Amino acid sequence: MKSSDEKKVLFVSGRFPFPLHKGDQLVLFNNIRLVSQKYKVTLITFYDNESELENLHKIKKYCEKVVLIKRFAIFSYINIIFSLFRLEPMQVSYYRSGLFKKKLNLLLSVDRFDLIHVYMLRMAHYVKDIPTPKVIGLIDSMHLNMSRRVLNETGLKKAIFKYEEWLLKSYENNCTEWFDRSIVVSKIDKEYINNHNVKVIPVGV
């Protein structure tokens, strides 16, 4: 049984953890499950469609509170257009939401969290200026992933991906400075980011 003075951890995610189809969803779910054994957990996350919420009970089992914000694809694509003027990676702009920021700020105003755990680079900007101790699960280097994709593309698509790669390089390195610790799953990703606060924790550990 959890005590009333137990420490609180806030998880911030761009993707609902169920169904467990992708690696980052599995990492998020396992971390919530493990952290909930000793701490009170709150999750704030986007979801894309109602079918995902059929599994809501599976995550509520481990969370004191779950805050859900629906992500509408049309607004995400509009954000990508504006990213050209912000010099911001498209993958970051895709997940920008005034409603998400509002809900997050409300959570932070009514609860005192001892740690904020953000999942993926695309969500980092939401907590950039929050003084609470912060950890980001980068999972892997998005800059490295994009550089690999560039090699397999041609024409206009290659040019777009090359531009995104350039933006991600700067953004990813700056992002790690906003957090007390950044986590990746392999040494290759750590070396590519090359920041002193990056720690390697393989999947399943």
Language-model regions, residue ranges each:
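N-terminal subdomain of nucleotide-sugar transferases
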Residues: M1-L68, D111
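Acceptor-binding helix/loop patch of EC 2.4 sugar-transfer enzymes
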Residues: G14, Y77-Y94, V135-S170
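Membrane-proximal helix-turn-helix segments that form the acceptor-binding/catalytic region
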Residues: N31, K102-L106, M142, K158-R181
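Short, charged/polar "capping" segments at the starts of alpha-helices
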Residues: N49-L56, Y126, K190-I193
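Short N-terminal targeting/anchoring amphipathic segment
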Residues: L104-M123, P133-V135
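A short beta-strand/loop micro-motif in the catalytic core of glycosyltransferases
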Residues: I116-H117, E177-S186
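Carbohydrate-associated surface elements
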Residues: I188, G204
